[in-house]
């Protein structure tokens, strides 16, 4: 018996079966699923200014049962990693950019946990194969990436930091029914000195985690409200209830100012723009209309 030929025959049969099942369920509605996040490079890390490379993807199926399947979670993890890995830095005013569904579906699937499998199937082929195994429609709803190279040596006072957060996770702590990405900017004449401190790194991690919880836990729709108004959907107007520790009775905007001053990001001779600021955020819920 020729084992290699037998394996090729079996693979062909599995592919043909998956193609038939995918065609059969193509017209079904898929509004369940998970939102996945991945951060390949967070920006300020380990006392250095590095680039930012992250992604958020929503993968859908028909039932919550399949959404809780480990195979589904593994595929979402690989697709999210692929989006973050192949995305190019954006030449636009905004850092967070929608990622083309066509480009992503036609891209080779790149696994972070199983690199030996890289390039053996495209994203769309991997989705089709999962349909063949679970019998449900699997579809991509949306994806976004944030990719920015490190600031040059001519901009030593600027750095970025990306924070990812999910809620209602199952298998993977980077996946849930609600997901968010937030991008922070740090600006200071003393930036290199300040970020070299391990204490500062720990404090920044804590701040990012709290901001992620805040964006998800509150009905957050924007960063600032229009001048002269207060909006419960504006992040900076909300009480910073999701920060664990002193100061969480302040608004998020006031807290960020105090936080930057206490950690010497802002000095008396600094311009007003020095400190820490939320530049952009994205917040998704599974199945919502886009």
From Swiss-Prot:
Taxonomic superkingdom: Eukaryota
Residue ranges the record marks as coiled coil: none
GO cellular component, one term: mitochondrion
Gene3D superfamilies: Elongation factor Ts, dimerisation domain
Pfam families in the record: EF_TS
BP GO annotations: mitochondrial translational elongation
Transmembrane parts of this sequence: none
Keywords: Elongation factor, Mitochondrion, Protein biosynthesis
GO molecular-function terms, A-Z: translation elongation factor activity
Protein location: Mitochondrion
PROSITE patterns with a match to the protein in the record: EF_TS_2
UniProt record similarity statement: Belongs to the EF-Ts family.
Function, in words: Associates with the EF-Tu.GDP complex and induces the exchange of GDP to GTP. It remains bound to the aminoacyl-tRNA.EF-Tu.GTP complex up to the GTP hydrolysis stage on the ribosome.
Note: This protein may be expected to contain an N-terminal transit peptide but none has been predicted.
PANTHER family assigned to the protein according to its UniProt record, in alphabetical order: ELONGATION FACTOR TS, ELONGATION FACTOR TS, MITOCHONDRIAL
Designated name of the protein: Elongation factor Ts, mitochondrial 1
Organism: Postia placenta (strain ATCC 44394 / Madison 698-R) (Brown rot fungus)
Higher taxonomy: Eukaryota, Fungi, Dikarya, Basidiomycota, Agaricomycotina
């Amino acid at each position: 018996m020729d084992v290699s030929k037998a394996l090729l025959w079996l693979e062909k049969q599995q592919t043909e079966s998956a193609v038939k099942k995918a065609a059969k369920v193509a017209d079904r509605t898929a509004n369940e699923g998970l939102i996945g996040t991945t951060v390949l490079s967070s920006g300020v890390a380990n006392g250095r200014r590095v680039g930012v490379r992250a992604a958020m993807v929503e993968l859908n199926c028909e039932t919550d049962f399949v959404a809780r399947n480990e195979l589904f979670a593994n595929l979402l993890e690989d697709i999210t990693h692929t989006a973050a890995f192949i995305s190019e830095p954006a030449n636009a005013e905004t850092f967070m950019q929608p990622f083309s569904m066509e480009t992503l579906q036609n891209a080779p699937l790149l696994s972070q946990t199983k690199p030996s499998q890289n390039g053996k199937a495209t994203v769309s082929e991997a989705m089709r194969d999962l349909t063949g195994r679970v019998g449900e429609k699997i579809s991509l709803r949306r994806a976004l990436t944030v990719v920015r190279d490190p600031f040059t040596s001519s901009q030593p006072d600027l750095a970025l930091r990306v924070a990812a957060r999910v809620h209602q996770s199952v298998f993977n702590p980077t996946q849930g029914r609600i997901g968010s990405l937030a991008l922070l900017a740090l600006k200071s004449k003393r930036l290199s000195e300040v970020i070299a401190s391990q204490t500062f790194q720990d404090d920044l991690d804590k701040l990012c985690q709290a901001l992620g919880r805040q964006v998800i836990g509150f009905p957050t729709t924007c960063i600032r409200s229009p001048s002269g108004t207060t909006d419960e959907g504006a992040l900076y107007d909300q009480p910073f209830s999701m920060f664990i520790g002193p100061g969480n009775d302040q608004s998020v905007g006031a807290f960020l100012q105090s936080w930057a001053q206490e950690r010497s990001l802002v000095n008396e001779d600094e311009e007003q723009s020095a400190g820490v600021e939320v530049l952009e955020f994205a917040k998704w819920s599974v199945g919502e209309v886009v």
